[in-house]
Amino acid sequence: RAPAQLANASAAIAALRALLPVLAISDAAIADGVRSARLAGRMQVLPGPVEIVLDVAHNPQAAQQLAVWLGANRPRGANLAVFAALADKDVANEVAALMAHIDLWYLAGLADVGGRGQPVEQLWQKVGSLLSRSLATRHATVVQALAAARKSARAGDRIVVFGSFHTVGEALAALAPAA
């Protein structure tokens, strides 16, 4: 789990402890809850010959946390990123935070989400200069980008899907039989 998740769990435990006079919660129940807590798309790891990591990471701070985790958990092979983000996000700094950890980029567009979606060409205009030395491909949708990444991945590689709840949601839907 990422450091931010541990900090969040610590804050939740502190809040529970403050409520102990009102709520009868045992230490064992708290520990059980922390061990079993899961949120789809937040540092979600799907093991396999090609591991898939799904993390919303929709701002530079979250991308930095993902970078820390990737740095501490290197795959045997390459890290392939599937990235799509909403138009109003700081995508340049999200990409910059992860550049040292990603070997191949699969950029994708997002359907219009309340006026905030963006086509892949708009995303490319914002991050293309950062990726000029990296191998980056552009795809109309997250599903297409994920399919391309899965097709090129080899055993020992990892696919990292990030950028928004919409990005991860589309990927999870495409992976439904595997997830």
Positions of the model-derived regions?
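Short, active-site-adjacent cap segments at secondary-structure transitions
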Residues: 167-169
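Active-site-proximal loop/hinge segments that shape catalytic or ion-binding/gating pockets
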Residues: 164
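Nuclease catalytic cores that cleave nucleic-acid phosphodiester bonds
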Residues: 176
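Nucleotide phosphate-binding/pyrophosphate-handling subdomain across enzymes
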Residues: 1-104
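Short helix-capping segments at alpha-helix termini
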Residues: 23, 74-75, 128-132, 179
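C-terminal helical cap/extension that packs against the catalytic core
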Residues: 6, 17, 51-53, 95-157
